Amino acid sequence: MTYECFDLTIEDGIAHLRLNRPEKANSMVPSFWKDLPEAVNALSRDASARVLVISAEGRHFSSGMDIAVFTEGGLDGPTGGSRHVKAEAFRHHCMALQDAFTCLEEARMPVLAAIQGASVGGAMDFITACDCRYATKDAFFSVHETAIGMTADVGTYPRLVKLIPEGWARQMSYTAERVYAEKARDIGLINEVYDSVEEMVDGVMAIARQIAGNAPLAVSGAKRMINYARDHTTADGLDYIAVWNASMLDGEAIRNPFMAQAKGEKPEYEELLPVAKTAGE
């Protein structure tokens, strides 16, 4: 299937989604908000990839929401009715945009973002929903909505405050300043900084291969447990992992890879099964 704003390939268990509108700084046009969750949810449903890498062509990862959205009434919401019923309808419109990125967080496979140049506005909503983020040394990050008189509403605030120290989340949000890659790594937004796009993509793909080489059920379970633990107490997290393993731990599935590793052989793991609909959809 083809998409307007990105290309998608799958090889050796690694899905690679490349934003492909470099001439427009990979801005997010209306079709992006439909196509991204469609593509990610399809990967998650059919279990065709063990990991998803997201990168971008051109100088910038993404400049966020396309300018047409702001200049052609895209933020005005539904027409007709009183202010109150329009506001209620706009809430659903906003939540649909939020779902376009929440699908990354809810996907059965890990999602790795490789970022160069600008990651501003809606792109911050985008990358904070990914599992891990990597950047080139020229990359910068900005909650730019504040500078245009808007409170970011598609996911930045609830996720950013759980990724970096609260003081930095507040400073970035209040000032709309640019935080460059080295500082972003220092505060925990970025895992690693690379000298060039080529080095970054090679490095992220190497990490993706490591992930793809592990048991899909264990990796998917780890993602689920980390997401749950982030949003719950330690006691809740311990209880959930105990229930999870009580139902999904397979002794034979562990013994076989263990024995293969002991013999210096490459372990083989059972793939996740395709499903009609994932829990996050």
Language model features with spans:
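Terminal low-complexity tails and localization/encapsulation signals of metabolic enzymes
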Residues: 1-3, 258-281
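Crotonase-fold acyl-CoA enzyme core
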Residues: 102-217
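Conserved CoA-thioester-binding segment of acyl-CoA-metabolizing enzymes
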Residues: 1-57
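Charged catalytic carboxylate motif
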Residues: 31-35, 96, 103, 203, ...
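C-terminal long alpha-helix characteristic of the crotonase
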Residues: 134-139, 190-239, 247-250, 269-280
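Short, active-site-adjacent cap segments at secondary-structure transitions
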Residues: 58-63, 120-121, 226
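Glycine- (often His-adjacent) and acidic-residue-rich active-site loop
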Residues: 56-99, 149
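Terminal peptide-recognition signature
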Residues: 17, 21, 36, 54, ...
